[in-house]
């Protein structure tokens, strides 16, 4: 089956926003107007099509990014729905990696909220061109122009209005298109009927003012338009569209539209803008990767004639078909039933079926082409971030980096039957989500699960119960502390066993050095002249990493250390991988004790929004929680306090904040970095831990 839509008529887009900006409702409306859904779902009724996991429907938030395909004006639009809650930033990163463009949805009242900033920065990192949609124009306090100012101040963006609203709050009834200088007024409730009219008198002045701003902004990015503008010549709508498209794709501007998805106003012009201004796979630079054999950089252009390569960006377990692997195809063609090569894992896999995902049903397809997004069944070894390619033309695409989990809880199965199923459930969930980690506490034998926040772990436990029918008891949340060192040391490790027959001999000299925060782990091999044979070097590395799982202070994982192997010796007969692993692990533990080990704790970036009168109490409380206040600003009539606070001090904060502000304060927090724990606090933690 040849490709249905040419590449230039394909759009891979994400919809990104803060919780409650109305992202899921906007997606729903897009599916309704493009004819994929016949009755609209409402989030607060729990029937929205994109929120297809049961918990999402209960909580009214979007957790997993479902990929959906729809059509508009002869274009295929693949939508990746991204979650807006801070515990799920990894889902957002993961979807941005495979998108070509995005719609950023803002609430007309809240404007740029903390999560919007995070998501915006993530989109900057992956250089994703975007258009902005100011939603909820019908609610009290809606202010379109205020949101544009906030986008400039907070995001450092260059927002350019291509519409202005007609009316606001309950009088919001349509928009002025600043390209055609015509008004679009919505007549019926479903928003399917709209009239194009002359601009009403009450918005004429503001429309004129913003039309000039639009022309000036476009002229800055396009010389031809600049000349025409300065000479007072007529600029056609087509010329303007082409210039805005170019500037958007080059990240020079963000076109801004407005509407009210819930009231069905403004969604069709938003779809037009996706087609008019967001890039197709052809407009995006060739994807870069490297050869697994030589390590040199390779490019793959978005074309069916290039060798096949794709990125697995999401794994999901589906009750009917088992494991679904979502793929973004960058080049070439993949047929259902064919073999692919997983270059990340160095394994061949067979693709059983290929599915095109619609919001609530799926269709089997024979093949996928460069630029497409699909789900594959049958890839048992593939995990998130793996590259799939043609075996004769191997390439590894840059993988995604995922943050380390910051919070953990102990869980235990309620019954013997649960125990057997628990392992399988945890393994499946960890496959889907790289920020969810499982470990065992060797002293107590407890299973620990770690994630990005309390909500993240609650949802994991909930899914175990619903999808895998596993009941577990959950302990109190604990902070995921880490250990590191403060000074450099050189240390020797020897492991020698002689007792009849073949002995064991491993001998290493290591240097341990501290790295800056977030430096992770580096292993440097400085062995010269073969004092330790090449084949034992990986064992030394493995031994060190094994020892790093459990630090010398309190058994927490060790981070931010460079380990250099600079000397040692071996025995012709007795040396083995195991002997070098043990010698390296012993040396590391010994060295760490001498290198001034310290505890590290996760520091959260916290933003608290409170009415003015509670300001003093709330700030006092943040200081009492060892918080560092970074800054304050007025937002509307509320004060926003930005601070860095250790996660250990944030448990139960929601309840405290509610009681201090009579339920009027809100806060968001997300992991920012690790920092050394003050000595007096560290002593208490170690005392508790080592009891």
Swiss-Prot record:
InterPro entries: EFG_II (IPR041095), EFG_III (IPR009022), EFG_III/V (IPR035647), EFG_IV (IPR047872), EFG_V (IPR035649), EFG_V-like (IPR000640), EFTu-like_2 (IPR004161), G_TR_CS (IPR031157). Its main location: cytoplasm. One of its GO terms (cellular component) is cytoplasm. GO terms for molecular function: GTP binding; GTPase activity; translation elongation factor activity. It comes from the Bacteria. CDD domains: EF-G, EFG_III, EFG_mtEFG1_IV, EFG_mtEFG_C, EFG_mtEFG_II. GO terms for biological process: ribosome disassembly. It is found in: Cytoplasm. Belongs to the TRAFAC class translation factor GTPase superfamily. Classic translation factor GTPase family. EF-G/EF-2 subfamily. Catalyzes the GTP-dependent ribosomal translocation step during translation elongation. During this step, the ribosome changes from the pre-translocational (PRE) to the post-translocational (POST) state as the newly formed A-site-bound peptidyl-tRNA and P-site-bound deacylated tRNA move to the P and E sites, respectively. Catalyzes the coordinated movement of the two tRNA molecules, the mRNA and conformational changes in the ribosome. This is Elongation factor G. The gene is fusA.
């Amino acid at each position: 089956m040849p490709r249905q839509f040419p590449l230039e008529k394909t759009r891979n887009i994400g919809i990104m926003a803060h919780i409650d900006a109305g992202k899921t409702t906007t997606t729903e409306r897009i599916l309704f107007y493009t004819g994929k859904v016949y009755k609209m779902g409402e989030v607060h009724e729990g029937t929205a099509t994109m929120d297809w996991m049961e918990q999402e429907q209960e909580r009214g938030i979007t957790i997993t990014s479902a990929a959906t395909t729809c059509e508009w004006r002869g274009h295929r639009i693949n939508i990746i729905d991204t979650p807006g809650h801070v515990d799920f930033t990894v889902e957002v990163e993961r979807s941005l990696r495979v998108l070509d463009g995005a719609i950023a949805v803002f609430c007309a009242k809240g404007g740029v909220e903390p999560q919007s900033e995070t998501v915006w920065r993530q989109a900057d990192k992956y250089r994703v061109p975007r258009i902005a949609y100011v939603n909820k124009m019908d609610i009290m306090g809606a202010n379109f122009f205020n949101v544009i100012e906030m986008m400039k101040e907070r995001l450092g963006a260059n927002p350019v209005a291509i519409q202005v609203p007609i009316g606001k709050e309950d009088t919001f009834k349509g928009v002025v298109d600043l390209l055609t200088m015509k008004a679009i007024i919505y007549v019926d409730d479903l928003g399917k009927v709209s009239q194009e009219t002359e601009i009403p008198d009450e918005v004429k002045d503001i429309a004129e003012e913003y039309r000039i701003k639009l022309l000036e902004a476009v002229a800055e990015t396009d010389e031809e338009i600049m000349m025409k503008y300065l000479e007072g010549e007529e600029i056609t709508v087509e010329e303007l569209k082409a210039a805005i498209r170019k500037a958007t794709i080059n990240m020079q501007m963000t076109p801004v539209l407005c509407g009210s998805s819930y009231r069905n106003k403004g969604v069709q012009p938003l779809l037009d803008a996706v087609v008019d201004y967001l890039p197709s796979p052809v407009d995006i630079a060739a994807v870069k990767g490297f050869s697994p054999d030589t390590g040199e950089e390779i490019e793959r252009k978005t074309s069916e004639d290039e060798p096949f390569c794709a990125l697995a960006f999401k794994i999901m377990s589906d009750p009917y078909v088992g494991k679904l692997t979502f793929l973004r195809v960058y080049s070439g063609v993949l047929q259902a039933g064919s073999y692919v090569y997983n270059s990340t894992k160095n394994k061949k896999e067979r693709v059983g079926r290929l599915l095109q995902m619609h919001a609530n049903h799926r269709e089997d397809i024979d093949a996928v082409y460069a630029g497409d997004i699909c789900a594959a069944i049958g890839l048992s070894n593939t995990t998130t971030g793996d590259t799939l390619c043609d075996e004769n033309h191997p390439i590894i695409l840059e993988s995604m980096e995922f943050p380390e989990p910051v919070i953990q809880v102990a869980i235990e199965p309620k019954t013997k039957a649960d125990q057997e199923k628990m392992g399988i459930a945890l393994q499946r969930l960890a496959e889907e989500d790289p920020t969810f980690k499982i470990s065992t506490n060797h002293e107590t034998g407890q299973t620990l699960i770690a994630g990005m926040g309390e909500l993240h772990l609650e949802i994991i436990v909930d899914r175990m119960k619903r999808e895998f029918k596993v009941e577990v008891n959950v302990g109190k949340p604990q902070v995921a502390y880490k250990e590191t060192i403060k000074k450099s040391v050189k240390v020797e490790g020897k492991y020698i066993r002689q007792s009849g027959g073949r002995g064991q001999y491993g001998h290493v000299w290591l240097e341990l050095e501290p790295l800056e925060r977030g430096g992770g782990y580096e292993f440097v091999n400085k062995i010269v002249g073969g004092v330790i044979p090449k084949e034992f070097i990986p064992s030394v590395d493995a031994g060190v990493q094994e020892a790093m799982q459990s630090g010398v202070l309190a058994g927490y994982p060790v981070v931010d250390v460079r380990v250099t192997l600079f000397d040692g010796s071996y025995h012709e007969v007795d040396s083995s991988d195991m002997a070098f692993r043990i010698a390296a692990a012993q040396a590391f533990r010994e060295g760490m004790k001498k290198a001034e080990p310290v505890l590290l704790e996760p520091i959260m970036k916290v933003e608290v929004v409170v009415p003015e009168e509670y300001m003093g109490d709330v700030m006092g409380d943040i200081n009492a929680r060892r918080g560092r206040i970074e800054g304050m600003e007025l937002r509307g009539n509320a004060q926003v306090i930005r601070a860095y606070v250790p996660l250990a001090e944030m448990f139960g904060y929601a309840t405290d904040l509610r009681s201090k502000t009579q339920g009027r304060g809100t806060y968001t927090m997300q992991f920012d970095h690790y920092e050394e724990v003050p000595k007096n606090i560290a002593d208490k933690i170690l005392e508790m831990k080592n009891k």
